[in-house]
Amino acid sequence: MTELVLVRHGESTANRDNTYTGWSDVPLTAVGIAQAHQAGKRLRATGLQFGAVHTSVLKRAIVTANIMLSEIDQLWLPEYKTWRLNERHYGALRGQNKDVTRQEYGKAQVQQWRRSFYTVPPLLTPAELDHDRRYTKYGAAVEPRGESLKMAYDRIMPYWIDEIAPRLLDGQNQLVVAHGSTLRAMIKYLEHISDTGIDGVEVANGVPICYHLDRQLHVIGKEEY
């Protein structure tokens, strides 16, 4: 049996302020830092040993991962940072307050943007793209103007196939510290959740979710720590 642990980053300033974040690189709050320490302590109590940790290129996930690795005394582990594990890109909604958008566009429309598998949020214009050097080296197509959860799912899965799954098949436990929507996409895949069923899945900040996997990487058990 191999273990896959998924953890959403601790509370960010955008979580605290109730704004859409996406690829905006916001820091953790003091609460988020405490959540990361607590997640690490809960993981330490399990005694799990990991082969590698995977995270995004956004600081809220990277800092959470490093705090957790310190708590479990495994800071020496290989740490793989990839844009493919970035949060879903919320397009022109980024930085906007969620309550304000509900008032402006209506609750039903906002719910579709946030939770639907296929609905794409309002897009950034080409002029509004950041052209961040973290992404430009991969080509213009990498930095999206906005994404549905399906689009995020499609960019995550190649990383799962090429980097995470082979290590699990080799018997190495893996730790993934990422974001709410991207972890929902991975959970959809692992648990075979339908396109409509995924809208009800929530991932809390700083709560380790451990999947027990058989030799074919089928889920045979699940725990939250």
Swiss-Prot record:
GO terms for biological process: gluconeogenesis; glycolytic process. GO terms for molecular function: phosphoglycerate mutase activity. It is an enzyme of class 5 (isomerase). The keyword rRNA processing does not apply. The keyword Protease does not apply. Keywords: Gluconeogenesis, Glycolysis, Isomerase. The record marks 179 as: Transition state stabilizer. InterPro entries: His_Pase_superF_clade-1, His_PPase_superfam, PG/BPGM_mutase_AS, Phosphogly_mut1. Substrate binds at residues 8-15, 21-22, 60, 87-90, 98, 114-115. Its EC number is 5.4.2.11. PROSITE patterns: PG_MUTASE. Pathway: Carbohydrate degradation; glycolysis; pyruvate from D-glyceraldehyde 3-phosphate: step 3/5. It catalyses: (2R)-2-phosphoglycerate = (2R)-3-phosphoglycerate. The active site is at 9 (tele-phosphohistidine intermediate), 87 (proton donor/acceptor). SUPFAM superfamilies: Phosphoglycerate mutase-like. HAMAP family: PGAM_GpmA. Belongs to the phosphoglycerate mutase family. BPG-dependent PGAM subfamily. Catalyzes the interconversion of 2-phosphoglycerate and 3-phosphoglycerate. PANTHER family: PHOSPHOGLYCERATE MUTASE. This is 2,3-bisphosphoglycerate-dependent phosphoglycerate mutase 1. It comes from Lactiplantibacillus plantarum (strain ATCC BAA-793 / NCIMB 8826 / WCFS1) (Lactobacillus plantarum). The gene is gpmA1.
